[in-house]
């Protein structure tokens, strides 16, 4: 699994498709190449202290490790934003939510339409 590390990559993924799920939000963006899928993980301080945030990130990384080979598409960047519910949700449910979020993300248009001004 390749990781996103640069801020620019995270910001670029934020312009793509968002697929909310129980415990996290999945952001997906097509890069336009055939390289393997890349994943990034982020959890804000709203979720809790460092121990809780790291626990959420570990759970999200494990979900991706177990499922991304099958469901993720090459040439895409994915960012998982952890939410507080990820601390208490059963792991099996989070795995199902991840699979559903990937399906929803790939079923939507890959670019957002431009916002028209009202002038």
Protein language model annotation of sequence segments:
Residues 1-119:
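Positively charged, solvent-exposed patches that mediate nucleic-acid binding
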């Amino acid at each position: 699994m390749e990781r996103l590390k640069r801020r620019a990559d995270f910001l670029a993924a934020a312009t793509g498709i968002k697929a909310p799920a129980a415990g996290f939000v999945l952001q997906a963006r097509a890069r336009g190449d055939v390289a393997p899928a890349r994943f990034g993980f982020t959890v804000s301080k709203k979720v809790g202290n460092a121990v809780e945030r790291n626990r959420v990130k570990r759970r999200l990384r494990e979900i991706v490790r177990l499922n991304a080979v099958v469901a993720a598409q090459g040439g895409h960047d994915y960012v998982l934003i952890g939410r507080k519910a990820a601390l208490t949700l059963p792991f099996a449910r989070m795995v199902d939510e991840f699979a559903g979020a990937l399906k929803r993300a790939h079923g939507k248009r890959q670019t957002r339409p431009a916002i028209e001004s009202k002038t």
